[in-house]
Swiss-Prot record:
Disulfide bonds join 43-50, 57-126, 185-196, 245-276, 277-303, 290-294. The keyword Disulfide bond applies. GO terms for molecular function: interleukin-17 receptor activity; signaling receptor binding. This is Interleukin-17 receptor A. The lineage of its organism: Eukaryota, Metazoa, Chordata, Craniata, Vertebrata. Gene3D superfamilies: 3.40.50.11530, Interleukin-17 receptor A/B, fibronectin-III-like domain 1, Interleukin-17 receptor A/B, fibronectin-III-like domain 2. Coiled coil: none annotated. The gene is IL17RA. It comes from Homo sapiens.
């Protein structure tokens, strides 16, 4: 690569102008890291097969660490070289060169990773050398070079070379880093590069300034080969002074291509001031590569020098001239003394009051001209870090104060979560920034503890930060996304005016402001909020001869508004929380090591426990059990007052095994006027003895009335209210047994007496066999219909117990008959006898419903009574 040629002294010709125009069009619009494509990327050497690949700066050896890793590079050197692209453009590149250490670690060297970090934008680009063969000792040092990283003028980079595989987290580092500063476009070699040429490094405007008559200046300069507008800045100064006495600005539209490299003449009119004679003229271009930050060229016009040729004084002066000069001097002195005496008398006389009033009126006239500038509706975008729920509340109250007290529209992520969810985080952030730039609005950056930590993590100098509030929000951490979006603006000083850097002095400090905003002014809130408001309005607080003030926003006057008082209350709450919990930020960081034991304000202040301590939500499943031989059921039929279908409620109570006891069955029969029967079947308490169960008798089934081994039966007796109603076709409950005829009641009492005597005789003999009386139920179909009705309702009555099938009942009865017949029966208590009597009465009432079976029942009942 040859040395750079010096630029020609003469003005470039038309052919060179067209070439420079083409280079300006092809030049990139913004500075960014990239690789040069002038030749293929080659890293192979004799004895080594190697390829160069683009890398993501994250090698897989960090995920899968190796036991044996190579040592670090040696003699890392970085130099500035220049290279041409395929289109012939000249770009500055970073020439990186390093060597390997002569130890056995080269046997485990699999490659190298080159990383270039641009410090002002935090942009990184990586390239990986992948060795396809193992390195061997060849009696000299292995040396590698790479010259494809394109750098920009006046930028600083950090170059790092990693040997692969990378070491384990606790191992010694095997990389080497160096900083590299690229010179600006004033450098002789950098001046002829494509990036510098596109920003006008070779442009020589050759400014000439001529002073014309009638207080005018003629400015002439040479245009550059880019169609862009120019601006002429004229500043005039008094002789031998530095403060300006006149300023003027003149815009020149973009020239046509045929006017490139031609002279442009502009005539400027000066103010008629005799002492304002020294002028400074500046030409500011607006090239596409640098916009309003391009280099300015200036020229100065000095004050004209007066000739020092004094007039010759005559040697002889007449005497009368002396007397004339003396007289004039006396008159002047006398006039001055007289004027002083008159002024003193007038001020002390009666007319002084009037003069004073006139003076006040005269002094008050200029005050009428001091009209405050009109305020415009503005919009701001607030960028902040959600450090804590209380700090988020402070930001919300600050936004509310801007809306209500200042009339300023606010763009805040907390107020536009739906729009962020629909458009996406980066799309919404880019849209807000574009809107702020187009409307010439301001972006307020609220700095806090989290902004400093996130900025350090963004630079790679601190631990990663993940706050609870960011984790809880649907959109996540918007501060990091916003910082990535606004970072390129801080390469251009002209963009600094868009950003207003603030921090709440009550809960934050000046050290929480990231280094990125070091060149921007910092405003502690709410002490200097008045200045922030003037920044939002694009007004200067201090101007020549006047000072703008907003009394409602100065000092502590913001507390007069409701929004200001709410903001102060939010600041006090957060400050008190910081005093109570000094390590609050570490507790809010989810990446902190002791996060498990840290208390959270979400649980203490904003949330209440849903369940008492030590309890939880328990899911219980019902356990369905079939009534067995040890089960007991008691039936209590009740009569409803309203019409409707019959509803049966069955609740089985299982008797614990090993505690059998005889339990009499009881049945309650109640009558209703009109309506359906509502029957509730509930288990009765058991004492000890054999259990009983519920079964429905079929036609021809023998049902024993006494004896503990037998199965007990509950029967529901339906008695018709009207004796004329047919018992077979009526489903209405029957009346009380007191309504029966006298002979029927006497027959029933005799039957019960005979049964009682039989039971007593069985006790006297030490045991009794099964009763001989068998009741035949001719109304089995009707009972079967009742049973089917009860079973059909079980699907709708959740608490009904399933009924055992008839076959199972008969099998159980046969098994009970096979038991020991010689087992003596236990004595009956008076309560058992009363229950038995009630049962027999129910059976009799059922038989009375059936006219056809009365004679048979009577003959069979007389037998056992005898």
């Amino acid at each position: 690569m040859g040395a750079a040629r010096s630029p020609p002294s003469a003005v470039p010709g038309p052919l060179l102008g067209l070439l420079l125009l083409l280079l300006g069009v092809l030049a990139p619009g913004g500075a960014s890291l990239r690789l040069l494509d002038h030749r293929a990327l080659v890293c192979s050497q004799p004895g080594l097969n190697c390829t160069v690949k683009n890398s993501t700066c994250l090698d897989d050896s960090w995920i899968h660490p190796r036991n044996l890793t190579p040592s670090s590079p040696k003699d890392l050197q970085i130099q500035l070289h220049f290279a041409h692209t395929q289109q012939g453009d000249l770009f500055p590149v970073a020439h990186i060169e390093w060597t390997l250490q002569t130890d056995a670690s080269i046997l485990y060297l699999e490659g190298a990773e080159l990383s270039v970090l641009q410090l002002n934008t935090n942009e990184r680009l990586c390239v990986r050398f992948e060795f396809l063969s193992k390195l061997r000792h060849h009696h000299r040092r292995w040396r590698f070079t790479f010259s494809h990283f394109v750098v920009d003028p006046d930028q600083e980079y950090e170059v790092t070379v990693h040997h692969l595989p990378k070491p384990i987290p606790d191992g010694d580092p095997n990389h080497q880093s160096k900083n590299f500063l690229v010179p600006d476009c004033e450098h002789a070699r950098m001046k002829v590069t494509t990036p510098c040429m596109s920003s006008g490094s070779l442009w020589d405007p050759n400014i000439t300034v001529e002073t014309l008559e009638a207080h005018q200046l003629r400015v002439s300069f040479t245009l550059w080969n880019e169609s862009t507008h120019y601006q002429i800045l004229l500043t005039s100064f008094p002789h031998m002074e530095n403060h300006s006495c006149f300023e003027h600005m003149h815009h020149i539209p973009a020239p046509r291509p045929e006017e490139f490299h031609q002279r442009s003449n502009v005539t400027l009119t000066l103010r008629n001031l005799k002492g304002c004679c020294r002028h400074q003229v500046q030409i500011q271009p607006f090239f596409s590569s640098c916009l309003n930050d391009c280099l300015r060229h200036s020229a100065t016009v000095s004050c004209p020098e007066m000739p020092d040729t004094p007039e010759p004084i005559p040697d002889y002066m007449p005497l009368w001239v002396y007397w004339f000069i003396t007289g004039i001097s006396i008159l002047l002195v006398g006039s001055v003394i007289l004027l002083i005496v008159c002024m003193t008398w007038r001020l002390a006389g009666p007319g002084s009051e009037k003069y004073s009033d006139d003076t006040k009126y005269t002094d008050g006239l200029p005050a009428a001209d001091l009209i405050p500038p009109p305020l415009k509706p503005r919009k701001v975008w607030i960028i902040y870090s959600a450090d804590h729920p209380l700090y988020v509340d402070v930001v919300l109250k600050f936004a509310q104060f801007l809306l209500t007290a200042c009339g300023t529209e606010v763009a805040l992520d907390l107020l536009e979560e739906q729009a962020i969810s629909e458009a996406g985080v980066m799309t919404w952030v880019g849209r807000q920034k574009q809107e702020m730039v187009e409307s010439n609005s301001k972006i307020i950056v609220l700095c806090s503890r989290g902004t400093r930590a996130k900025w350090q993590a963004l630079l790679g100098r601190g631990a990663p930060v993940r706050l609870r509030c960011d984790h809880g929000k649907p959109v996540g951490d918007l501060f990091t996304a916003a910082m990535n979006m606004i970072l390129p603006d801080f390469k251009r000083p002209a963009c600094f005016g868009t950003y207003v850097v603030c921090y709440f002095s009550e809960v934050s400090c000046d050290g929480d402001v990231p280094d990125l905003f070091g060149a921007a002014p910092r405003y502690p809130l709410m002490d200097r909020f008045e200045e922030v408001y003037f920044r939002i309005q694009d007004l200067e607080m201090f101007q020549p001869g006047r000072m703008h003030r907003v009394g409602e926003l100065s000092g502590d006057n913001y507390l007069r508004s409701p929004g200001g008082r709410q903001l102060r209350a939010a600041l006090d709450r957060f400050r008190d929380w910081q005093v109570r919990c000094p390590d609050w930020f570490e507790c809010e960081n989810l990446y902190s090591a002791d996060d498990q034991d840290a208390p959270s304000l979400d649980e203490e202040v904003f949330e209440e426990p849903l369940l008492p301590p030590g309890t939880g939500i328990v899911k219980r499943a019902p356990l369905v059990r079939e009534p067995g031989s040890q089960a007991c059921l008691a039936i209590d039929p009740l009569v409803g007052e309203e019409g409707g279908a019959a509803v049966a409620k069955l609740e089985p109570h299982l008797q614990p095994r090993g505690q059998p006891a005889p339990q009499p069955l009881h049945t309650l029969v109640l009558a209703a006027e009109e309506g359906a029967l509502v029957a509730a079947v509930e288990p009765g308490p058991l004492a000890d003895g054999a259990a009983v169960r519920l079964a429905l008798a079929g036609e021809g089934e023998a049902c024993p009335l006494l004896g503990s081994p037998g199965a007990g039966r509950n029967s529901v007796l339906f008695l018709p209210v009207d004796p004329e109603d047919s018992p077979l076709g009526s489903s209405t409950p029957m009346a009380s047994p007191d309504l029966l005829p006298e002979d029927v009641r006497e027959h029933l009492e005799g039957l019960m007496l005979s049964l009682f005597e039989q039971s007593l005789s069985c006790q006297a003999q030490g045991g009794c066999s099964r009763p001989a009386m068998v009741l035949t139920d001719p109304h089995t179909p009707y009972e079967e219909e009742q049973r089917q009705s009860v079973q059909s309702d079980q699907g709708y009555i959740s608490r009904s117990s399933p009924q055992p099938p008839e076959g199972l009942t008969e099998m159980e009865e046969e098994e009970e008959e096979e038991q020991d017949p010689g087992k003596p029966a236990l004595p009956l208590s008076p309560e058992d006898l009363e229950s038995l009597r009630s049962l027999q009465r129910q059976l009799l009432f059922r038989q009375l419903q059936k006219n056809s079976g009365w004679d048979t029942m009577g003959s069979e009942s007389e037998g056992p009574s005898a």
